[in-house]
Amino acid sequence: MYNRLNARLSGEDKSRNPVTLIWDEYIANILALANEDKKKAAVVMNKVSEILLMGRSKSVRLIVSCQRPDAVAFPVGSRLNYGVVVVLGAFVRSVYDMLMPDHIEQVKGREFGLGEGTVLLQGSQLHFIKVPKTSNVEELCKGALS
């Protein structure tokens, strides 16, 4: 992903078809890598930051998911470059302090049920959401891909 972004930035790759990396359990991966090799983990986090900073203009996108964010794996600079931030589940002050600090007052005291939470668009538009429960995931996937 990082090499594809650099090829687009340098002009070597002139294509603009969207490229998206979905990284499930990002925090767990980064923390495990940091336990093995802190320098390598820092290199990976710097590359993630660069993808977030430069990727949008070249149609290179990164989607990460995690059970609970950790400041170690989300340096302040990279946190600011996520275009869409979704938080599902119970209000945890530390999560909102890290990912949506300007919107804590709007969320504080609110109770979220299963599949409910917030979405922050481009750092300014906060919305309350509910992800619907579905029993036909396979059918939805087939429909989305056709």
How would you describe each model-predicted region?
Residues M1-R4, A41-V64, F91:
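Substrate-engagement module of ASCE P-loop NTPases
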Residues M1-W23:
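Mechanochemical coupling/switch segment within NTP-driven translocation systems
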Residues Y2, N6-S10, L31, L52-R56, ...:
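Signal for well-folded cores of large energy- and translation-related assemblies
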Residues L9-S15, K47, L52-S59, G77-N81:
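Conserved catalytic network of the ASCE P-loop NTPase/AAA+ motor domain
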Residues T20-I22, L62-C66:
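Short beta-strand segments at enzyme active-site cores
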Residues I27-A28, D70:
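Short, glycine/acidic-enriched loop or turn micro-motifs at the edges of active sites
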Residues A28-M45:
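Flexible beta-alpha connector loops of hexameric P-loop NTPases
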Residues V64-L145:
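Conserved ATP-driven motor cores of ASCE-family P-loop NTPases powering translocation/secretion/packaging/pilus
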